[in-house]
């Protein structure tokens, strides 16, 4: 109809993918955003609580009047580190990654340390490679697969009117890259999409350049992109 697909110039399925690729590329180009670096991702004071170079769109809790109560606040729900105002630390209702998803993240992917490995859970000291505000005693309480992605505001574990004040990610540029890759698989072919996915992963997420998409058709390419969306945007 004139108010729907016709108005967008879409007459076939592939037109949808062409538009998706075009809009995703426009968002990348016009936002001025860059994928998060490893240091931004793992920053103990600002990691996933303060907008940075990759965030296109956010919501903000900037005052205690906006906050109301930690119990139903964003940071109170998703953070694992505070025993004063998070459901994880206070109520033991930790937000965890599923084991089946975690097991699909290779060691070469630096995002893997976002979650507590089963072999590291319960240790008396914080194992190497993790970014956390906790000391050994706090670490020992974390169950396997607990997330360390969302740090309290300003890295404050004790004052809810500081730790629960934060920015909330609604859209990051990484999602635009992944939308673009999935879309061009339909318009330019699987090999073209694989090349862009390989380049993205090795430039921004792998430490050794070893990522290589093994997709052989549209379905397996979509599965590869979906896996990266699940890892990259976990909890968002």
Walk through the language-model features, giving the residues of each.
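Acidic/polar-rich alpha-helix caps and helix-coil junctions
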Residues: 1-71, 103-236
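Periplasmic/extracellular electron-transfer cofactor-ligation site
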Residues: 29, 97-98
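Domain-scale macromolecular recognition modules
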Residues: 74-76
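Short, cationic low-complexity segments
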Residues: 78-94
């Amino acid at each position: 109809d004139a108010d729907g697909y016709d108005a967008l110039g879409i007459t076939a399925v592939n037109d949808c993918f062409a538009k998706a690729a075009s809009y995703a590329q426009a968002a990348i180009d016009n936002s001025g955003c860059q994928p998060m670096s490893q240091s931004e991702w793992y920053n103990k004071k600002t990691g996933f609580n303060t907008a940075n170079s990759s965030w296109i769109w956010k919501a903000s809790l900037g005052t205690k009047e906006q906050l109301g109560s930690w119990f139903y606040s964003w940071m109170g729900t998703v953070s694992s580190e505070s025993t004063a105002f998070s459901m994880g630390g206070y109520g033991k209702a930790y937000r965890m990654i599923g084991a089946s998803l975690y097991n699909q993240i290779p060691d070469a992917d630096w995002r893997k340390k976002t979650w507590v490995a089963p072999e590291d859970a319960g240790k008396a000291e914080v194992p190497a490679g993790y970014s956390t505000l906790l000391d050994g005693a706090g670490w020992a309480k974390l169950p396997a697969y607990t997330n360390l992605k969302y740090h309290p505001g300003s890295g404050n574990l004790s004052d809810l009117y500081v730790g629960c004040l934060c920015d909330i990610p609604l859209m990051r540029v990484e999602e635009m890259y992944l939308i673009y890759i999935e879309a061009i698989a339909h318009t330019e072919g699987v090999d073209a999409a694989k090349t862009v996915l390989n380049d993205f992963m090795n430039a921004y997420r792998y430490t050794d350049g070893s990522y290589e998409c093994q997709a052989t058709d549209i379905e397996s390419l979509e599965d590869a992109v979906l896996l990266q969306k699940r890892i990259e945007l976990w909890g968002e």
